[in-house]
């Protein structure tokens, strides 16, 4: 891949992002023919990964001028920045917004790979990963595994080989590189989770989706380093509506009237689904009285041809809604009802509703539920499945972000748990003991509460608290994660399922 400096100039001018060029000869608004015809062969925002042919982006709150100085010493000649730096570079390209500039230049450098793919984007406070996986399984059937996926849990650019994601939605440079790789791998469809931070920080600036899916909205990610208010969080989430050719909306989502109004105002066609028929609902589902894993899709007009019976492996009515949203999105990009039925029936999600049996016959659930709504839905489902026993819940909360979850977890534990085991979950730079204390401070119900900071020991303790086969133990928050984020380092972690399984095997 290459791009000329003239092409870079044109991209920036088109978006009104260019301020000026700085070279040893001075400050200018234009480029000489010699300089303008020069091409760069790589893009980077890592100052340790540059050559003379790299276009380097000076971005981030933690960026320091010394990083650029060191990069220039290593041979870097061209940089993009919001401010000029006193460095002996051949060219500084000064822009009004570095994140927007990186997005549009990454698109151009990788030859607009989004235009060569069918793009499906999911947003919502909960359910994004599960709904994305349902869509992946459906489209794998429809496209013979020519579907790429970027998700919180795992990602694949060839439809088969998975790798761990660093961010829910990657930086724009990485995103377009991944899209270009997917195109080179023969992929025709591209599914991704779109976070509120992706819109707030312009990672998906100017990116439009063939289909967007808005699952739900509840307060989350509200903290000084994420979203200062719920309004800011919700506004960023709503940007998916205005950047989709068609939007799929959940009728039961909080603030649904505003979501629908946003789509109407932006003239974005909307398809509405829900758990109950209603005048505004295009597709609803009814749960089978004979089989809790079966549901019936109903529709007054059935414009997409989706009405019929579906079976899935994942329990919980909320997963039926996730499956229905995936089916609607999949049909909009070329799948058939039969392919939807086949894909939904086959879907499994790492770290979602995984279960095993404790030594005394009690069921152990491992799930990624990591905010109020997802944990409440999970615990409600488990309560319904195990009405006669105690519900033992192991949970922790992340450090340095989503601080409001600590209060939320105390609240949901008070509402639904019988026993709580508080432990470590990606504490980052914070003291996990203090995080657990904050959660416990918001538990208002009289109940046993244990704090065991070593997560492996906490899992063993939670399982040992079960006394009958009627009990249920929920290990929440980590899902299939195989690391703990501690002080900027991803420390290896065996995983909740593996640790629970090892404890059970040792006791048997």
From Swiss-Prot:
Q: Which UniProt keywords apply?
A: ATP-binding, Cell cycle, Cell division, Cell shape, Cell wall biogenesis/degradation, Cytoplasm, Ligase, Nucleotide-binding, Peptidoglycan synthesis
Ligand binding (ATP): 124-130
Please tell me whether the keyword Ligase is annotated for this protein: yes
Motif L-lysine recognition motif — list its residue ranges.
Answer: 425-428
Q: Where does UDP-N-acetyl-alpha-D-muramoyl-L-alanyl-D-glutamate bind?
A: 47, 168-169, 195, 203
* Domain of life, per lineage: Bacteria
The record's annotation in HAMAP family points to: MurE
Function according to Swiss-Prot or TrEMBL: Catalyzes the addition of L-lysine to the nucleotide precursor UDP-N-acetylmuramoyl-L-alanyl-D-glutamate (UMAG) in the biosynthesis of bacterial cell-wall peptidoglycan.
The protein's name: UDP-N-acetylmuramoyl-L-alanyl-D-glutamate--L-lysine ligase
According to its UniProt entry, this protein's organism is Enterococcus faecalis (strain ATCC 700802 / V583)
Q: Which gene encodes it?
A: murE
């Amino acid at each position: 891949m290459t791009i000329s400096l003239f092409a870079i100039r044109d991209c920036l001018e088109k978006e009104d992002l260019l301020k000026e060029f700085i070279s040893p000869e001075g400050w200018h608004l234009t480029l000489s023919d010699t300089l303008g015809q020069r091409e760069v062969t790589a893009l980077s925002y890592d100052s340790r990964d540059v050559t003379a042919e790299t276009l380097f982006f000076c971005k981030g709150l933690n960026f320091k001028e010394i990083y650029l100085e060191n990069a220039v010493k290593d041979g870097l000649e061209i940089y993009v920045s919001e401010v000029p730096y006193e460095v002996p570079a051949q060219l500084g390209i000064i822009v009004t917004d570095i994140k927007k500039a990186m997005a549009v230049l990454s698109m151009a450098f990788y030859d607009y790979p989004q235009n060569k793919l069918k793009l499906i984007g999911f947003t919502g406070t909960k359910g994004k990963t599960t709904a994305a996986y349902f869509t992946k399984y459906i489209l794998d059937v429809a496209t013979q595994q020519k579907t790429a996926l970027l998700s919180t849990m795992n990602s694949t650019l060839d439809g088969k080989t998975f790798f761990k994601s660093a961010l829910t939605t990657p930086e724009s440079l990485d995103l377009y590189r991944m899209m270009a790789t997917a195109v080179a791998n023969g992929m025709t469809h591209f599914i991704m989770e779109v976070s509120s931070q992706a819109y707030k920080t312009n990672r998906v600036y100017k990116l439009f989706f063939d289909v967007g899916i808005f699952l739900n909205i509840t307060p989350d990610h509200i903290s000084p380093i994420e979203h200062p208010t719920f309004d800011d969080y919700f506004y960023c989430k709503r940007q998916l509506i205005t950047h989709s050719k068609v939007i799929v909306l959940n009728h039961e989502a909080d603030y649904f009237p505003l979501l629908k109004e946003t789509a109407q105002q932006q003239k974005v066609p909307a398809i509405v689904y829900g758990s109950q028929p209603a005048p505004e609902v295009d597709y609803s589902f009814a749960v089978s009285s004979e089989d809790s894993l079966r549901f019936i899709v109903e529709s007054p007009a059935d414009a997409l041809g989706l009405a019929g019976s579906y079976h899935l492996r994942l329990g919980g009515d909320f997963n039926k809604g996730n499956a229905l949203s995936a089916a609607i999105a999949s049909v909009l990009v070329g799948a058939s009802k039969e392919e939807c039925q086949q894909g939904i029936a086959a879907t499994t999600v790492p770290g979602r509703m995984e279960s095993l049996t404790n030594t005394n016959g009690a069921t152990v659930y491992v799930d990624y539920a990591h905010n109020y709504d997802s944990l409440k839905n999970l615990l409600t489902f488990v309560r319904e499945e195990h009405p006669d026993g105690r519900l033992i819940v192991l949970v922790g909360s992340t450090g340095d972000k989503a601080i409001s979850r600590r209060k939320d977890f105390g609240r949901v534990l008070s509402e639904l748990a019988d026993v709580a085991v508080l432990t470590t979950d990606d504490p980052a730079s914070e003291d996990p003991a203090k995080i657990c204390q904050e959660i416990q401070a918001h538990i208002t119900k009289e109940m046993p509460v244990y704090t065991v900071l070593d997560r492996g020991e906490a899992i063993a303790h939670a399982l040992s608290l079960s006394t009958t086969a009627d009990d249920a133990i929920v290990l929440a928050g980590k899902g299939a994660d195989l690391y703990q984020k501690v002080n900027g380092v991803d420390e290896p972690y065996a995983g909740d399922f593996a640790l629970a399984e090892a404890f059970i095997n040792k006791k048997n």
